[in-house]
Amino acid sequence: MAIPKAHYSLAVLVLLFVVVSSSQKVCNPECKAKEPFHCDNTHAFNRSGFPKNFTFGAATSAYQIEGAAHRALNGWDYFTHRYPEKVPDRSSADLACDSYDLYKDDVKLLKRMNVQAYRLSIAWSRVLPKGRLTGGVDENGITYYNNLINELKANGIEPYVTIFHWDVPQTLEDEYGGFLSTRIVEDYTNYAELLFQRFGDRVKFWITLNQPLSLALKGYGNGSYPPGRCTGCELGGDSGVEPYTVAHNQLLAHAKTVSLYRKRYQKFQGGKIGTTLIGRWFVPLNEFSELDKAAAKRAFDFFVGWFLDPLVYGKYPTIMREMVGDRLPEFTPEESALVKGSLDFLGLNYYVSQYATDAPPPTQPNAITDARVTLGFYRNGSPIGVVASSFVYYPPGFRQILNYIKDNYKNPLTYITENGVADLDLGNVTLATALADNGRIQNHCSHLSCLKCAMKDGCNVAGYFAWSLMDNYEFGNGYTLRFGMNWVNFTNPADRKEKASGKWFSKFLAK
């Protein structure tokens, strides 16, 4: 998960975890017109109100849980060791949850939670140390993922596999700049085909990319993620051009991989393939201001439409073309046809909604400010939703974005591939406090309530994955944020304990 730090300008969040106002309104399980902001009865709410074939799962990613043992370096390894000051606790994921050694324990946690599915990712450099097929396949890495997938299947848990979750092999960064170069499209497609060949007999759900926006903006817009490039960054960069190049190349890699899967593997393997986008909703700061209404629409187009428009319509949003000009790459007619419709399903990661207000043009081109929008979580000092120690979350936005996608993007088959909230842990949180995470129960319960409402509205949603199965290394925040439904001791990762939220989710699914 990527914490929604300021992409434009945001209010600073320093309040305590979950402050709930009874005057605020959102969906409840009955989906009435006016409902309390929190779940009235978390014990009574359960999965019985969802379709029988609806999938519930939990999610993680390779870099955040596996540890670095027995794999080649990726961009995050290099970045966190070269620039430890970029992470609040100066940490890396060298050990993390040690899931490379403890994957059977991971599956036990999943089994205890009663989930039907597990969203995981493959570490590119664990199976292809040089990043490309010509550099050789690491059969030990293949064996690791075979063992994990087999363990999941043996326990009745369906694997949903993310092919790329921001961990570019460092060899490809060194050789040609990773996703800055079109050369990565072929290497990525070959890597994906290797996964189809080795795991496709058991994996029936493939996710090509995780939040391509985050890699583009944070890796190349402000340099807070690897490879740490931006205008004025030590490693160089151009914040007004490179994010658009990287986004474009990710879309091409996705589209060519989907085309390959459909032509060579889908018919006899019987799987589906899609991608996961960030799902953020935007509310006009002044609901009566036409400028703010337009700003909220622009924010959506620059955050979500940037990727969803090409995937559904084969072209970038018109407003982006008008405002970004020739800095925004063009699809050739052949590329447009390839990208258009390259989704069997849409994955959506939803965490927050924000207020949007019109902003003046930036002083210099930058993909982070090109939309000319100022974003925040507060209106006249009042938060948009529930104030947590990590961010402010707004469950009604969940329903609103799903309905907007239904109405404007042909109502695609959708899986909620991430949703959750973090607790801040600066080393001063007792174990008892960490395990009593009632705020997380409210977060999941309220979002599931709004999801149920959205489905009654006709939104084509087929699954929900909680982020996260367990506490892990949070990109850009190290170990200072804990998203897990299970607690992990990061000095001894075999020490895991079920949180109150994990117990709640297990009971929610058992009913």
UniProtKB/Swiss-Prot annotation:
Enzyme Commission number, as recorded: 3.2.1.147, 3.2.1.21
Listed Pfam families: Glyco_hydro_1
Catalytic residues as annotated in Swiss-Prot or TrEMBL: E418
Gene Ontology MF terms: beta-glucosidase activity; thioglucosidase activity
Positions of disulphide bridges: C31-C450, C39-C445, C230-C233
Residues the record marks as carrying a glycan: N46, N53, N222, N428, N489
Signal peptide range: 1-23
GO biological process, one term: carbohydrate metabolic process
Tissue: Specifically expressed in roots.
Highest taxon above the source species: Eukaryota
Chemical reaction(s) catalysed: a thioglucoside + H2O = a sugar + a thiol; Hydrolysis of terminal, non-reducing beta-D-glucosyl residues with release of beta-D-glucose
Broad EC category: hydrolase
Positions that bind a beta-D-glucoside: Q64, H165, N210, Q211, Y351, E418, W467, E474, F475, F483
Keywords: Disulfide bond, Glycoprotein, Glycosidase, Hydrolase, Signal
UniProt family annotation: Belongs to the glycosyl hydrolase 1 family.
Annotated PANTHER family: GLYCOSYL HYDROLASE, MYROSINASE 4-RELATED
More details: It seems that the absence of a catalytic proton donor in plant myrosinases is not impairing the hydrolysis of glucosinolates.
Function statement: Hydrolyzes sinigrin and, with lower efficiency, p-nitrophenyl beta-D-glucoside.
Protein name stated in the entry: Myrosinase 5
Species per Swiss-Prot/TrEMBL record: Arabidopsis thaliana (Mouse-ear cress)
Gene this protein is translated from: TGG5
